[in-house]
Amino acid sequence: MAPTSSFPHQGLYVITKEGSSNIDLLRAHVQGALRGGARVVQYRAKRAAHPLLEAQALLEVCRTQGVPLLINDDIDLCLKIGADGVHIGHEDEKLKVARNRLGPHAIIGVSCYNSVDRALSAQEDSANYVAFGRFFPSSTKPNAPQADIDTLTLARQELSVPIVAIGGVTAENGVMLLEAGADLLAVIEGVFGAPNPEAAARRYNQLWSPT
């Protein structure tokens, strides 16, 4: 499979909230985030009632805006709807399986938590980007391992693929993550937990395009 959109080198990376059963609301929230400047959308379907329908709806939205849609940890769903790629855990074999099944042009991102060595291994095994975190307290994954901001600096020196920072990222603390070496900031609650996802996305987007 070949993605219709390439993975960006910087910008806001939004991840949908789990457990939503309203496809129209999910679509509207993602549309708002894209209007606000989001550059990547990841769909998380672990507790979704209708993952296929939701993913198809979001793919249509993302295609319209020329933004890649990635599926969280579900290669089958990615293939079924023709999404641009997947985001997976750090397991070496899972990355190899994903690349074999999705092909050389699919976008594949890997969670590396606080390990630059893991990120280097993922890069060597053809990951298109790596993600580190959580950096700050997170309501989505409160028990996720803590990552050190210094990890971003070391990763920036060692890696050539884009670096994503995740975990409790706000428009305020995101500055230090970008200064430390992150290229993209991944956000869930900060955008989709806000009253106005479009306005929230715009606030984050100012970190790359200050006025």
Language-model segment annotations:
Residues F132, T140-P145:
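Phosphate-binding beta-alpha-beta segment of Rossmann-like dinucleotide-binding domains, i.e.
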Residues A180, L184-V187:
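C-terminal binding/interaction regions
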Residues F135:
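Conserved sequence/active-site signature of Rossmann-fold short-chain dehydrogenase/reductase
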Residues E93-K96, S138-S139:
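A short, polar/charged loop-to-alpha-helix boundary motif
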Residues M1-D92, N100-N128, A144-A147, L154, ...:
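Conserved N-terminal beta1-alpha1 strand-loop-helix module at the mouth
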